[in-house]
């Protein structure tokens, strides 16, 4: 697996949001994932240090996991089908491993809140771009 980090969230002239995940080690490879406006908001808020007046869905998920005795451990971008990426949230609960199917945007929003690593399966490298080809 390849560890990633959130580089930025962009919006194009058509109003489409994209989260750009860069490989954490070399910072040369970018995996762009198109997301919705609310999902972009959910990812950017904790990165900017903002706290909503009421819990957003990822905050609720984090609280529920923790109240049920779980500890989020990592997020994995597992695959792609058509234009849709797939992800998993890995949780440790009393020594047992729990894996939840997730949209990547929700998993990433949880990862930035819990400060847990984001990974992608190595075969997804064919869907990445060189960072020098991306205009921020």
Regions found by a protein language model. Name each.
Residues 1-136:
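Divalent-cation
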